[in-house]
Amino acid sequence: MKIKSLYALLFCIFTTGCLDGQKQSDHAILIAYTSTEFPELGSSVCYLNERGDTVIPFGKYHYGGSDTIRHIGFVVEPHTPGWTTINNKGEKLFYTFSFDNGPDYVEEGLFRIINDEMLMGFADTLGNVVIQPQFAFVFPFKDGKAEVTYTGAKKAMDDYGEHWTWQS
């Protein structure tokens, strides 16, 4: 595992050195290292840049499935309303809506985000907030449109409460 990680780090160093004069800080790549042999959801994680410098230390976030971060990545923070989305500098951007046991899927280049008040909006895959959180619930984009509502409530679809829908 350590050899594979070393190869991945060397690959990043060589590929980021060939950016045709573009600023490397704009294209920083972070690689995840976990406290477990294999990355496991929720395990302690740190992120190193292509030079091997620690950008995000162990303990700040837990592993959320992003083993490489070019623009944005998803990590887990205890007691937050979803997946935390960070940039390649380790800065928190926003929370991502949880869907199907993970961060929301990208539909038409956008995914759903939530704020501390549990209002929803949309962001793109570069970490730009495209539509500020302002809705009680939003459905993913389809054919250039998304259904949104300012009112309503979650309703369980089964006896276990694992699956739910939104009624407004």
Regions flagged by a language model, labelled:
Residues 22-168:
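Residue-level detector of conserved, function-critical positions
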Residues 1-25:
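Bacterial Sec-dependent N-terminal signal peptides
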